[in-house]
Structure formats: structure tokens, C-alpha cells
């Protein structure tokens, strides 16, 4: 798949085989389908090229954008002329084979299986309370935003249905989409046998689909190298600006869980480098693994969810598909197509890495900048709240989601809680009355009781602190 899409990218550039032979840096985005001993070197051998530099990246939704930015900086320094970034996953095939009981064997496996390349381990409190899955953590951010806006439980989910229906319409026109099907907002927002609740407020049709077979490749070159290779001017799309920034590593560390200060920094940096404002953007692809990743980016840009420009050029990760760490390669490839069809326009592509921690924004246009865009400015270190493992007594719920089983029934509530002293921690609840209340009443902002129990904080709520929030 990697070789196929790189060959297609070379042909699409108009330079053909010469573009591949000119590649000085070949970056392969981390593959989750199976491990290789050295994916980038093996790919170079398959292509019959010998780039001086091969890179096997780490994980996360910002990885392709960071690889592009790093290549552009090497070009600015005169160290590189042509680079390639490629990603691919065959998770759908792997899962299908597993269901059928068929063995699979990866080519060129490492001598020993390597651990998943997390840059930062989970916090001990996250381990104790099983705060691992992205559908859980991003749901927590959405519930904090919902409470901050004062929107009812049902109303917020209806809004998510409208958001994803807009994306599904784009996916329906995308021949590369995994689910190229337009859906009505109510078909996305309403739980049912074929659209179960996953983690409130998310139904199945609101979450990224990773089990896809997809690959994408990008070829990057200096203006001079593109001239030498004979890339036609109408095939060129230029990086006009980039911004990178970090939010806190751990979910509970985020001081205001309803927004992303780092997104504002990164987006602002990309736009300033490009010399444009938000109103100058014609096309957007905002990282869309879950609702909060889209909403936080829209909020950071000052754009409403009903903006006529939309927020995706692919159809979004729930409909287009989210192939591991590689989605942004697909977004950038589709953005290049859009901009070729709309010469002179500007497009913005974002990436989100880990649990709302890493953020990358890149701005593009068919018009080159008068001068080379500056490197991303250094972003300030994020503010954090202290996270503790043990909670006891009265706390305030900062964010809360109910996880549902495959039958759609609620199984467990996970909450981020704050002590009177301002420390944060996690708590869980499985009481039937609590789970029922969480489906009827906004728990975020309410007081609750927590007691430690064998390394896990147990949350209880007597319903007395109901206030006025509701459905």
C-alpha cells in the first residue's frame, strides 16, 4: 500500500519516477496493523530508491503534520530538497482475518515485539480507573464543554448529530471514504440497535472508525527542485504557515476542560505565518476523531459549527475513516485537490495527538508566499492542575461520561473530580441509580461524594445537588 500510494503521488505530481529517485527523506507514519523491523528502509528497498534519510515516526494524530513541518524546516536550512511522507493501515483486513480464525504474518517483523511507543506513560490514576480509550477521554471534554455552554444533555447530542451529518454529506461525495453515505442528523444522534451509545454523549456513528484499509502519501519539494523535476505549476500547493502547541498531557490536568488554549496558539501561529486571517480561509479540515476535537478547533478559530465552509474536506474520521496515526496525510492530500480546483484560495488542516494534548495547524495555498514562511513559534508551556490518585469526601464533578456495553446498556460512569483545594482526580461509579441520573441530569458542576476503595475512587451522588440543568 505504501509503495502504491507513493507511486500514485509521484505520477500525480507530473514528475513520475524522477520524483521518487530525488527523495532525500522518507518518513513512514507508525503502523498499528503490525510492526516492522524498519518500515522506512524496507519501503525504500521496495521502491528501489536510496534516500539518505529514512524516518519511522511515533504515534499520534499530529505525526504527519509534524513530519511535513520538519521536512520544510530542513529545506529552509538547505539540508533537503525533496521529501516523502506516507501512511497506511490494513486494520480492517486484520480484524476480518481474526474473525475468520485465519492467521496473518507480517513481512519483516522486528526480532522482538516492541511496546507501543507512547511518549508519556499514563498517569497512575488513569491506569487505576482505566482512563485509556480515546472515546472516553474526548467524551469527557465534550461534557465539560456542554456544561460550560449550559446546553442540555439531549440538546448537545442533537447538535453533534447535525455536526456529523454535515461531515457525512462530504464523505458521500468522497470515493475514498470508508462509509460514503449521507446521514440525517437524527440517524446519527438517536441511539438504536445499529447505533448504540458508546460513551455519552457519543453514539457509534459519532466516533472515529480505525478498522479501515487506507494509505496516503505526500511529496514535498523546494520550489527549485520542483522546477528541476518538471512539476507543472498547476500541480503545486505551497505550505504557507504552521503552528504547533501542547495542552497538558493528562486529561484531568487541563484547567478548563471545555476548551483548548493550545489550539488557539497553534492556529494563530499558522495564520500569522501565512499572513492571513480566519476569514481568508476557504477550505478547512479540522481533526475530527470526536466531537470535542472539532468543537474545540472551531471555538479556537471563532467559527460556528454551521459555517458554510464546513470543517472537513474528507468527510471526517467517523465517515471517511481514521487510519491510526495517518489521517492527516489523507486530509492534506484532499486539501491539495481542493486547492488545485480553487487556485489562490487558502486551506487550513489541523491534527490532534493523544488525548487532546498535541496540536498542529498547517496553512496551504496554490500561491507561494513572498518569502519562505517562518518556523513555528515556540509555544508557552501549558498550565496544569495537580492530579492525585486518591480522592475522599466532597468533590465537584468537572467532567463525566457514561460508558455503554455492546448491548447499549450503561455500565460505568467515569468522572474527573476536583477537591476543594483545587486538585484533580478520577472516580468511577456503577450504581444503577447513578447511571440513570447521569442520563437525565447534568452532573458536571455538581457536588458528589467519593471514597477510596482498593485503589479506585468510588463516586456516589444522592441527587440532592440537582440545580436547574437537565435534558
Predicted regions mapped to residue ranges:
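A basic- and aromatic-enriched beta-loop-alpha substructure that forms the phosphate/nucleotide-
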Residues: 60
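A conserved active-site cap/scaffold subdomain adjacent to cofactor or substrate pockets
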Residues: 320-328, 339, 344
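Conserved "HGTGT" condensation-loop signature of ketosynthase/thiolase-family condensing enzymes
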Residues: 1-56, 73-80, 84-212, 216-218, ...
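C-terminal substrate-binding/catalytic lobe of Rossmann-fold NAD(P)-dependent dehydrogenases
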Residues: 354-355
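Active-site capping/gating regions of soluble enzymes
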Residues: 347-349
Amino acid at each position: 500500500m505504501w509503495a502504491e500510494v507513493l507511486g500514485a503521488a509521484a505520477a500525480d505530481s507530473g514528475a513520475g519516477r524522477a520524483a521518487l529517485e530525488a527523495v532525500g527523506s522518507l518518513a513512514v507514519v507508525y503502523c498499528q496493523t503490525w510492526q516492522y523491523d524498519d518500515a522506512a528502509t524496507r519501503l525504500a528497498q521496495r521502491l528501489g530508491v536510496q534516500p539518505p534519510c529514512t524516518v519511522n515516526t511515533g504515534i499520534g494524530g499530529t505525526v504527519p503534520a509534524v513530519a511535513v513541518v520538519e521536512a520544510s524546516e530542513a529545506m529552509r536550512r538547505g539540508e533537503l530538497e525533496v521529501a516523502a511522507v506516507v501512511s497506511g493501515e490494513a486494520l480492517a483486513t486484520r480484524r476480518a482475518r481474526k474473525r475468520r480464525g485465519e492467521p496473518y504474518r507480517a513481512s519483516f517483523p522486528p526480532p522482538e515485539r516492541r511496546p507501543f511507543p507512547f511518549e508519556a506513560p499514563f498517569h497512575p490514576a488513569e491506569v487505576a480507573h482505566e482512563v485509556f480509550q480515546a472515546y472516553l477521554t474526548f467524551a469527557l471534554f465534550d461534557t465539560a464543554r456542554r456544561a460550560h455552554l449550559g446546553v442540555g444533555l439531549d440538546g448537545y447530542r442533537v447538535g453533534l448529530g447535525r455536526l456529523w451529518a454535515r461531515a457525512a454529506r462530504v464523505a458521500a461525495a468522497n470515493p475514498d471514504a470508508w462509509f460514503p453515505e449521507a446521514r440525517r442528523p437524527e440517524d446519527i444522534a438517536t441511539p438504536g440497535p445499529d447505533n448504540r451509545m458508546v460513551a455519552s454523549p457519543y453514539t457509534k456513528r459519532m466516533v472515529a472508525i480505525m478498522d479501515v484499509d487506507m494509505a496516503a502519501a505526500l511529496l514535498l519539494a523546494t520550489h527549485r527542485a520542483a522546477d528541476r523535476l518538471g512539476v507543472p505549476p498547476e500541480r503545486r500547493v505551497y505550505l504557507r504557515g504552521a503552528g504547533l502547541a501542547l495542552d497538558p498531557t493528562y486529561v484531568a490536568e487541563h484547567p478548563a476542560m471545555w476548551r483548548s488554549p493550545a489550539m488557539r496558539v497553534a492556529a494563530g501561529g499558522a495564520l500569522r505565518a501565512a499572513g492571513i486571517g480566519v476569514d481568508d480561509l476557504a477550505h478547512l479540515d479540522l481533526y475530527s476523531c470526536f466531537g470535542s476535537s472539532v468543537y474545540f478547533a472551531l471555538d479556537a478559530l471563532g467559527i460556528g459549527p454551521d459555517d458554510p465552509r464546513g470543517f472537513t474536506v474528507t468527510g471526517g474520521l467517523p465517515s471517511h475513516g481514521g487510519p491510526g496515526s495517518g489521517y492527516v496525510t489523507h486530509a492534506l492530500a484532499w486539501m491539495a485537490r481542493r486547492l488545485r480546483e480553487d487556485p489562490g484560495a487558502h486551506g487550513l488542516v489541523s491534527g490532534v495527538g493523544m488525548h487532546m494534548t498535541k496540536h498542529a495547524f498547517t496553512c496551504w495555498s496554490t500561491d507561494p508566499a513572498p518569502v519562505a514562511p517562518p518556523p513555528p513559534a515556540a509555544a508557552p508551556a501549558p498550565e496544569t492542575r495537580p492530579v492525585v490518585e486518591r480522592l475522599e469526601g466532597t468533590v465537584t464533578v468537572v467532567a463525566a461520561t457514561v460508558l455503554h456495553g455492546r448491548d447499549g446498556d450503561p455500565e460505568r460512569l467515569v468522572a474527573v473530580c476536583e477537591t476543594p483545594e483545587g486538585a484533580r482526580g478520577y472516580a468511577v461509579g456503577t450504581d444503577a441509580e447513578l447511571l440513570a441520573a447521569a442520563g437525565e441530569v447534568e452532573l458536571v458542576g455538581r457536588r458528589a461524594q467519593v471514597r477510596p476503595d482498593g485503589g479506585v475512587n468510588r463516586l456516589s451522588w444522592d441527587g440532592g445537588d440537582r440545580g436547574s440543568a437537565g435534558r
